[in-house]
């Protein structure tokens, strides 16, 4: 019988393949996106030192969101992570979509982060 691999297993393979080529530095950290069924998370990471510089998610108390799993929530998370990064003096980042397609919630987060001042 033919077995079908799960979408998440395929995503993890894709993410590992991309991460082998992509790394964040102190000057240009990595904006990482993780998407679950209910929430979306974004982190700005310095891979050289292994430090998370800034993070935001739909679980933050700063965001008052009714539906945390839609594109509007992802837009608010993108704005918040960009605002926090700019406050820390970070303007250039490398976008890591986490193996997800650049579509829907991931795209909404990325575009909101760009409009709020991050360059990638």
UniProtKB/Swiss-Prot annotation:
Source taxon at top rank: Bacteria
GO cellular component: cytosolic large ribosomal subunit
RNA-binding keyword on record: yes
Gene Ontology molecular function, alphabetical: 5S rRNA binding; structural constituent of ribosome
Keyword field contains Plastid: no
Function: This is one of the proteins that bind and probably mediate the attachment of the 5S RNA into the large ribosomal subunit, where it forms part of the central protuberance.
Family designation: Belongs to the universal ribosomal protein uL18 family.
Assembly notes: Part of the 50S ribosomal subunit; part of the 5S rRNA/L5/L18/L25 subcomplex. Contacts the 5S and 23S rRNAs.
Protein name: Large ribosomal subunit protein uL18
